[in-house]
Amino acid sequence: MVHLVYCDNKEKVLAKILNGSKTMIIRSASGRKIPHSRVFSNEELYFIEKGSGLISTKATVKNVQNFVKLSDEEIKDIIDKNNLKLNLSEKQKERWHKKCLCLVEFDRMEIINPMKLDHQSNMDDWLIINTIEDVVEGTSIQYNYENSKMTAFNNIK
C-alpha cells in the first residue's frame, strides 16, 4: 500500500523531514486508528504540507512500532526514547500524548516533482491508498476507506 501523510505546516514538519532532522512520524489516538497496525516496512510514504495542496516528498517505511493501552509514563518514555528521530516540540509531545501510538520510521527520502492533490471532503491526515495517482488531480478516484479497515492479519490486541 501507499500512504499519504499530512505534515503540520505550523510546526514545520516537512521542513524537518527535508533537512534530515526528522526521520520518524508519530500518530496517536485514544484508540487504534489510521495508521496504527496498517503501515508496514518497505511501503511508500508521500508527504504533503497542510494547506499547500502539493505532494512533494516521498520516502520508504523502514520500521514501524505500534503500541496500545499505554500508561502516561509509558507514553512519555516511548516519545522521549524516539525523540531524536521524531524531533518533536513540547507542544507536539503534548498533542501526541495518547494511549495508542504508531511510530513510523522512514528512509530513502526524496523530493519529487510536485503533484496536486485532488482534495475530497472526507480525507483524514493519513490516507492509505493503492497508488499515489488515486489522490492526484487528473487521475484521482473516490477515496475508499476499505484500505483503512482492520483485517484479521493486522488486528492485534
Spans of features found by a protein language model:
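Short, basic/aromatic beta-hairpin or loop at an interaction surface
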Residues: 1-2, 8-27
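A broad, low-specificity signal marking well-ordered, structured residues that form hydrophobic/aromatic
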Residues: 3-5, 24, 45, 101-104
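Contiguous surface segments at macromolecular interaction interfaces
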Residues: 13, 28-31, 53, 67-157
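Short glycine/proline-enriched turns and hinge-like loops at secondary-structure junctions
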Residues: 19, 38-40, 54
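A short, compositionally biased N-terminal segment around positions ~18-40 that is enriched
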Residues: 24-37
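Short coil-to-beta transition motif at edge beta-strands of beta-rich domains
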Residues: 36-47
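Short, charged beta-turn/beta-strand-edge "cap" motif at the junction between a beta-strand
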Residues: 48-54
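Short beta-strand-centered aromatic/proline hotspots
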Residues: 55-64
